[in-house]
């Protein structure tokens, strides 16, 4: 089909090129999706999956809302998993932490599979069925509750590096009492001890017999008569 006459000049070439049809933008299936939904779905998807993969089929508002709710739970589980670094956990608690981490990862895998199945249109989840799945949401999951208890126990352990600062701040006194002035006491006067008698002297005194009284009287009378 020949081009319109205005696309050619007298020299046979249009300096501005041939006229093109106006570009018509394709419709965005997520035009009615709130920005919060977009962000949660982007964060809640499994590694290697983007939002475009989820909405490759024109999802309805109901499916998008269900995908958003599942993404919120996936993000909560991811946040809990980031809190636990096995290198900073005491050796006695590492096995328990590993068990709980495996439980959380299995729950997250179920959430991811449900999101992808909704995206490709393989399944249609009823609201009541989705609610039964969301009843084990991240905030009330048994595994997460056990993890919270374990985190509290580890925080009270002074041997943990990242808990030492918390325990130090809790051990500091909140108020300082005024110091009372010290009372000085005068030393009490002590009497000198009596000198101890030599045991040989005391034995000598005890060996001298007492003088009889009759001899003393005779001596007195003889002295008077001589005078």
Curated annotation (Swiss-Prot):
Keywords: Host cytoplasm, Host Golgi apparatus, Lipoprotein, Palmitate, Phosphoprotein, Virion, Virion tegument. Residues 213-227 have a biased composition (Polar residues). Phosphorylated. It comes from the Viruses. It is found in: Virion tegument; Host cytoplasm; Host Golgi apparatus. Pfam families: Herpes_U44. Belongs to the herpesviridae UL51 family. This is Tegument protein ORF55. The lineage of its organism: Viruses, Duplodnaviria, Heunggongvirae, Peploviricota, Herviviricetes. The gene is ORF55.
């Amino acid at each position: 089909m020949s081009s319109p006459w205005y696309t050619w000049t007298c020299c046979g070439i249009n300096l501005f090129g041939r006229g093109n049809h106006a570009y018509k933008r394709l419709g965005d299936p997520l035009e009615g999706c709130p920005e919060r939904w977009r962000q949660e779905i982007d964060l809640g998807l499994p590694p290697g999956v983007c939002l475009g993969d989820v909405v490759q089929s024109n999802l309805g508002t109901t499916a998008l809302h269900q995908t958003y709710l599942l993404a919120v739970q996936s993000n909560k589980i991811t946040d809990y998993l980031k809190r636990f670094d096995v290198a900073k956990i005491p050796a006695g608690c590492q096995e328990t932490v590993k068990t709980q981490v495996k439980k959380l990862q299995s729950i997250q895998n179920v959430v991811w599979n449900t999101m992808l199945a909704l995206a490709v249109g393989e399944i249609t989840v009823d609201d009541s069925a989705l609610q039964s799945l969301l009843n084990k949401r991240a905030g009330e999951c048994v595994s997460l509750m056990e993890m919270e208890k374990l985190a509290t126990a580890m925080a009270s352990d002074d041997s943990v590096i990242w808990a030492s600062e918390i325990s130090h701040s809790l051990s500091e006194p909140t108020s300082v009492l005024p110091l009372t002035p010290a009372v000085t006491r005068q030393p009490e006067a002590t009497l000198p001890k009596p000198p101890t008698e030599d045991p040989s002297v005391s034995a000598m005194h005890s060996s001298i017999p007492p003088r009889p009284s009759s001899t003393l009287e005779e001596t007195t009378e003889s002295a008077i008569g001589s005078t």
